From Swiss-Prot:
Protein name in UniProt: Transcriptional repressor NrdR
Disordered, as annotated region: 1-22
Cofactor binding comment, as recorded: Binds 1 zinc ion.
Polar residues: compositionally biased ranges: 1-11
Function: Negatively regulates transcription of bacterial ribonucleotide reductase nrd genes and operons by binding to NrdR-boxes.
Organism: Lactobacillus acidophilus (strain ATCC 700396 / NCK56 / N2 / NCFM)
Top-level taxon of origin: Bacteria
Coiled coil: none
Similarity remark: Belongs to the NrdR family.
Length: 155
């Protein structure tokens, strides 16, 4: 592995441990030439996944895009960054378990909404208001009533 400090190819692994819920290996390395220590990650290479948008266009799947959306919905809510990351992990796992090369943005949005509903009611409503593109107050109220009924049923 090339040292990012002196660019020599002589390094050794001094520590190795699982990372990212056992989906990656984190390795601490030390350059045998200059002694510089650095970290590398080894991950399973996954097949490219395309998201089919509502207008039919396709774009690469992006964890960052999902994370940005849920963080915006959960702004000023008592949700930690670890909870946001965990939610995105759950959504990505559901998507990858489908075993397909393309998935609709609607399906991804539904996965996000399902997990947000369990995490925070306000974040769920905020996300739903954009994702579902409410046309009027009655469709918004229907979503709120459905969510409240689901919560009552669960208790």
């Amino acid at each position: 592995m090339e040292c990012p400090n002196c660019h020599q190819n002589a390094s050794r692994v001094i520590d190795s441990r699982p990372s990212d819920e056992n989906r990656a290996i984190r390795r601490r390395r030390e350059c045998e030439n200059c002694g510089f220590r650095f970290t590398t990650f080894e991950r399973i290479e996954t097949a490219p996944l395309l998201v089919v948008k509502n207008d039919g266009t396709r774009e690469p799947f992006s964890r960052k895009k999902i994370l940005h959306g849920v963080m915006a919905a959960g702004q000023k809510r008592p949700i930690s960054s670890e909870q946001f990351e965990h939610l995105v992990d759950q959504v990505e796992n559901k998507v990858r378990k489908q075993g397909v090369s393309e998935i609709s943005s609607k399906k991804i949005g539904q996965y996000v909404m399902d997990d947000l509903a369990d995490l925070d009611d306000v974040a769920y409503i905020r996300f739903a208001s954009i994702y579902r593109e409410f046309k009027d107050m009655s469709s918004f109220m229907k979503t709120m009533e459905d969510m409240m009924a689901k919560k009552e049923k669960g208790n």
